[in-house]
Amino acid sequence: MLRTCTVTIAAMTLGAALVLGTEGRAGEPIQVGGKMTCKTPEQHSIPVEGDPGHVLVVQIETCVGSASGESGRFDGAQQRWFEVDDLVKGSGMIHGYELAKYKDGSTGITSYAGAQVTTMINGKPEWTALGTFEQTKGTGSMANIQVRGTWTAKPTSETEFVMDWVGTMTEGTK
């Protein structure tokens, strides 16, 4: 009887610890999404010698996010992107990092990668891009969450573009 009582008490103690300690456990993924309006204030193109039409591009982009509903925490985010593109005749791979500053003072660093495709439309090159992203670090309310998903982008002018993004946000995963 003593052994059964000890095992029961131990199991109850462990069960209580698990219930009381759920703060660090991952929550259910929430669908999130929004739009970013972006500008490219700085861009440097380096031609790849001996390979006509091949350039490496290093650029900084600034964006303002808009979102609502479950995605409301992303609304008004101020972002700076640091990007490297490897393009042949305007098409190729892109990769970068984005630093977001949110209204509540939190920050997030996100890694992204994708592909850009450039086609001629009415005699002018026009690009579209798509890819994936994942938040790698965060502070404040963004410190203990995971955000990942997909994005698509298209230009609105020579130095501006819009990006739509969708994904999942899971709290308590880091």
Listing of model-derived features with the role each one plays in the protein:
Residues 1-7:
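Positively charged n-region of N-terminal signal peptides that target proteins for export
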Residues 8-19:
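Bacterial N-terminal signal peptides
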Residues 24-174:
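Beta-strand-enriched cores of mature, soluble protein domains
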